[in-house]
């Protein structure tokens, strides 16, 4: 049975002891006299921790043992594509030619960096069937906001400012409604049919002269491919709207079908999902946005251009109707490097194979879990890259919720799936294994879910009180809001006052 390490680990500043040294600088060849102007000289002591290298390594190793990541084991968060991040990506991102350049350098001195951005754009254009990309957005939601801002500007530019409604299916990626609302649109929800795909009749009834566009995730968040996508595109375009592709689930269809060929006008991608760059710590991510030719003049500036005659890459600010910047400078460059390395290592056939295995893994897990007491599968049984089970029968019969199941999974040394999403599935367990887990890991995950089912019906309190073997037990969600402890100093002060007892 898994048991996570738990260390009573102080802050690195608290471990500091005066006089301890982790690194020494070489002596200068000659005496240097540097006079720092008074107005920029520090008034107080530079408070940096003083530790030896072994102490630093032990400190961060202990912290890592109380954590869990994609290198620890299966991490099947649905709609997140938590695949393994190849370490060659990190090697290339740490290359001095990447790590030590500055965005303010003259473009003549960063031709290699601009070439990387140019090549990445060519790959993304080919993969998606789009005509031009901006690499500026910092993440998926930032990409969504960029895309819907382009839609808004396009309609205003065409003399149709009344198009203020954005259609969003109830099975779309979760951030779509928020991004549309932030861009000033009224969000109209389109329901799913009994198969888990867009209800065409409802869509036809919803479109009109106020329709700006439809934001669609395909496959959707149930893991089901929208097989009537061509008809959906026809309905939206006939009404004068644009079709927006949320690339959250692109990992399911690489090399199989392209958004541009399905009728989409705009697409955003997540390099930190499909193209194996890290999700770590909330960023940095990257959410490139691609458009068809008729929308390229609305993209954020600058774009990266290539002068074939002079074999020179350059920053192109000649984008007449640009929506402006959506992030400072040019985007998260080191993330782009990682993604391009992944693309070049995998190649066309490798990407296609990755999607096939991702779909195979999701369907294998679905079939193995199907029929287990307490879990039911809504919609079509054939999935793409992810699957969504409902634990509603278990909740009704035992009182054990989807959240309880997720917490209990932690006791087996496995990361929980996404829970309570999509909202159209009650007590949802959204599982996306990705292509980088083995059959043995899938088998173990299913066995853990089956064992939790047995426990729910024989000894439900074991599940309801989980996790038992983690460094941190179940968090009090209510108290976390009422009395947040967001720093170590705050924790020590509250503990000294007796206001917390952990």
Swiss-Prot record:
Cofactor(s), names only, from the UniProt record: pyridoxal 5'-phosphate
Enzyme class: oxidoreductase
Alphabetized Pfam families for the sequence: GcvP2_C, GDC-P
Enzyme Commission no: 1.4.4.2
This protein's record includes keyword Membrane: no
PANTHER family: GLYCINE DEHYDROGENASE (DECARBOXYLATING), MITOCHONDRIAL (PTHR11773:SF1), GLYCINE DEHYDROGENASE, DECARBOXYLATING (PTHR11773)
The name this protein goes by in its record: Probable glycine dehydrogenase (decarboxylating) subunit 2
Organism, as annotated: Thermococcus gammatolerans (strain DSM 15229 / JCM 11827 / EJ3)
Record lineage: Archaea, Methanobacteriati, Methanobacteriota, Thermococci, Thermococcales
């Amino acid at each position: 049975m898994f048991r996570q390490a738990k260390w009573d680990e102080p802050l690195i500043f608290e471990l500091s002891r005066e006089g301890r040294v982790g690194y020494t600088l070489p002596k200068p060849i000659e005496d240097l006299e540097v006079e720092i102007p008074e107005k920029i000289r520090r008034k107080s002591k530079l408070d940096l921790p003083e530790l030896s290298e072994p102490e630093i390594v032990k400190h961060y190793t202990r912290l890592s043992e109380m954590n869990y990541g994609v290198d620890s084991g299966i991490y099947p968060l649905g709609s997140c594509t938590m695949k393994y991040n190849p370490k060659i990506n990190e090697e290339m991102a740490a290359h001095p030619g990447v790590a030590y350049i500055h965005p303010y350098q003259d473009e003549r001195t960063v031709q290699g960096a601009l070439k990387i951005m140019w090549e990445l754009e060519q790959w993304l254009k080919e993969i998606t069937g789009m005509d031009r990309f901006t690499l500026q957005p910092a993440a998926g939601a930032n990409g969504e906001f960029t895309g819907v801002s382009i839609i808004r500007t396009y309609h205003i530019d065409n003399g149709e400012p009344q198009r203020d409604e954005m259609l969003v299916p109830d099975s779309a990626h979760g951030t779509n409604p928020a991004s549309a609302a932030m861009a000033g649109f009224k969000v109209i929800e389109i329901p799913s049919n009994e198969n888990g795909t867009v209800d065409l009749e409802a869509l036809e009834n919803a479109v009109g002269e106020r329709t700006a566009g439809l934001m669609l995730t395909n496959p959707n968040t149930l893991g089901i491919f929208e097989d009537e996508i061509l008809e959906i595109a026809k309905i939206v375009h006939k009404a004068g709207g644009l079709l927006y592709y949320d690339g959250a689930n692109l990992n399911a269809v690489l090399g199989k079908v392209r958004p541009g060929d399905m009728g989409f006008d705009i697409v955003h991608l997540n390099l930190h999902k499909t193209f194996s760059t890290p999700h770590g710590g909330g960023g940095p991510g990257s959410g490139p946005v691609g458009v068809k030719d008729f929308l390229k003049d609305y993209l954020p500036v600058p774009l990266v251009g290539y002068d074939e005659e002079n074999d020179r890459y350059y920053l192109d600010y000649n984008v007449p109707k640009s929506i402006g910047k959506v992030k400072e400078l040019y985007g998260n460059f080191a993330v782009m490097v990682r993604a391009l390395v992944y693309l070049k290592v995998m190649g066309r056939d490798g990407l296609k194979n990755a999607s096939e295995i991702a779909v195979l893994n999701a369907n294998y897990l679905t079939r193995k879990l199907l029929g287990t007491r307490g879990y039911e599968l809504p919609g079509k049984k054939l999935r793409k890259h992810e699957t969504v089970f409902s634990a509603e029968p278990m909740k009704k019969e035992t009182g054990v919720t989807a959240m309880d199941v997720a917490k209990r999974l932690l006791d087996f040394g496995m990361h929980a799936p996404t829970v309570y999403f999509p909202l159209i599935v009650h007590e949802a367990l959204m599982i996306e294994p990705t292509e980088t887990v083995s059959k043995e890991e899938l088998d173990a995950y299913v066995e853990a879910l089956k064992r939790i089912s047995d426990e729910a019906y024989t000894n439900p309190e074991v599940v309801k009180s989980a996790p038992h073997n983690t460094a941190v037990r179940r968090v009090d969600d209510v108290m976390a809001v009422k009395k947040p402890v967001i720093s170590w100093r705050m924790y020590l002060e509250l503990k000294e006052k007796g206001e917390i007892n952990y």
